[in-house]
Amino acid sequence: GDVEAGKAAFNKCKACHEIGESAKNKVGPELDGLDGRHSGAVEGYAYSPANKASGITWTEAEFKEYIKDPKAKVPGTKMVFAGIKKDSELDNLWAYVSQFDKDGKVKAK
C-alpha cells in the first residue's frame, strides 16, 4: 500500500481515532501499535463487550475484514462506520496505520 494515500484515507477515521506520538483515546481507542495488538487492549478505553470478547489479534487480514464492515466482523461493536470497500484504499490505510509502533513512532523500515 501507499503510506501517503493511506494518511489521506485516515481522514475518515480521525473523527474517532488518533494515531502518532500524541495519540489519545477519543470516541474510539488510539491506534498506535495496532499491528499485532489484541482487540480490547488499550488502557483507559471502554470497549464494547463484543470487541473485548472477539479474541482478534490485529493483522493486515483481520484489519481489512473489519474495516470493510465492522458490524459484520464483530456483531455488537460500538464502532459506527459504514466501512471502506475498495481494496486499494484498505491496502493504503493499513500501510499508514501499521507503520506506527506502540509509542506512536514510525517503525524503521
From Swiss-Prot:
Residues noted as binding heme c in the record, renumbered to the chain: 13, 16-17, 79
Domain of life: Bacteria
Keywords in alphabetical order: Electron transport, Heme, Iron, Metal-binding, Transport
Presence of keyword Signal: no
Keyword Lipoprotein: no
SUPFAM superfamilies named among the record's database cross-references: Cytochrome c
GO molecular function: electron transfer activity; heme binding; metal ion binding
InterPro entries: Cyt_c-like_dom (IPR009056), Cyt_c-like_dom_sf (IPR036909), Cyt_c_1A/1B (IPR002327)
PTM per Swiss-Prot/TrEMBL: Binds 1 heme c group covalently per subunit.
Identification of the protein by name: Cytochrome c-550
